[in-house]
Regions:
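ATP-binding glycine-rich loop module of kinase domains
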Residues: 18, 24-53
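AlphaC helix of the eukaryotic protein kinase fold
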Residues: 44-66, 72
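Activation segment signature within eukaryotic-like protein kinase domains
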Residues: 114-115
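Catalytic-loop of the protein kinase fold
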Residues: 122, 126-143, 152, 157
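C-terminal lobe helix-coil module of Hanks-type protein kinase domains
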Residues: 162-253
Length: 290
């Protein structure tokens, strides 16, 4: 961004340290609040598009009053003649889910935990008319202790100029299921921004089910991915998703070994079906069927 850099002071108080990420027309910075002597994250948006900047600030104001530990906390909001800014809690020590998934898929029960927490956080914003609409693995932050937080609720959609239609709950439900798919397979199943992940594989022109890519996929997660991403069905809201996959572990589930199947190569088409996933049991959550 022209005119700002490390050392720039915003509102006479917030010192920019280093850029953290760029989404659409806004940049997140690692910063320092010189008044309270604490590290913060700043979302800085140029006011060359005043309507967009106003939408970002409006979304941030509504998000600031949602008290939920799964959402990135907003401390301050402001603007001057050049910039609009949103001051958030420090997230510089967290890793994005995209970064974690660049190392490979996660254990299925860790996917359940992360997506359950994300869904519960998004559900808390629904009462304020807030929807994410731009959910990707880059929006999910994981602390060193495993706490899950969602960034960009409302503001990412405003930055993108997304239409605030009446399908926000369903779009976020699809986004959460896409996160589950990515967590299970390490690939992104939706069009648009992949957050650096590879595109999901297809089989005979259709999106491969997670169980066709990796082993050990619980039946309920496999079915939710199929219904939501391939059949335009599945959960209608993040809260609906959370209810369907509950309960989940309150603590992180660590990786033990790679779950990638050697039977399913990352092809884009072809009619040869992969080797069948592990057989089903009476408990649908134990493993997915072929």
């Amino acid at each position: 961004m022209d005119g700002v850099g490390p050392g720039t002071l915003i509102a006479g108080r917030y010192e920019l340290r280093r850029p953290l990420s760029t989404r659409e027309s806004g940049t997140r910075w690692v910063g320092h609040d010189t008044t309270f002597d604490r590290d913060v994250t700043l979302l800085l948006v140029p006011r060359d598009d005043d309507a967009r900047a106003a939408d970002v600030l409006d979304a941030a104001r509504r998000c600031a009053v949602v008290d939920n530990p799964r959402l990135v906390r907003i401390y301050d909001i402001g603007q001057d003649e050049r910039w609009a800014w949103v001051v958030e809690e420090d997230s510089s020590g967290a890793r994005t889910l995209a970064d974690v998934l660049s190392e490979g898929p996660l254990p299925a029960e860790e996917v359940r935990r992360i997506t359950g927490e994300v869904a519960a956080g998004l559900d808390a914003g629904t009462g304020r008319g807030l929807h994410h609409r731009r959910l990707t693995p880059a929006c999910v932050l994981l602390s060193p202790q495993g706490a899950v937080k969602v960034s960009g609720l409302g503001t990412d959609a405003a930055l993108a100029g997304a239409d605030d239609g009446d399908d926000g709950e369903r779009r976020d439900a699809v986004g959460v299921v896409a996160l589950a798919y990515a967590g299970l397979t390490g690939a992104w199943p939706l069009s648009g921004d992949t957050a650096g992940l590879p595109r999901a594989m297809t089989l005979a022109g259709d999106l491969a089910r997670p169980s066709e890519v990796v082993g050990g996929v619980p039946g309920d997660l496999d079915a939710l991915c199929r219904l939501t991403l391939s059949e335009d069905a599945g959960p209608v809201s993040p809260g609906d998703y959370a209810a369907q996959i509950a309960p989940w572990s309150p603590i992180p589930v660590q990786r033990t070994s790679s779950r990638l199947s050697t039977a399913a190569a990352p092809a884009t088409g072809g009619s040869t079906a992969p080797e069948a996933a592990p057989g089903t049991t009476a408990d649908e959550r134990t493993s997915a069927g072929p």
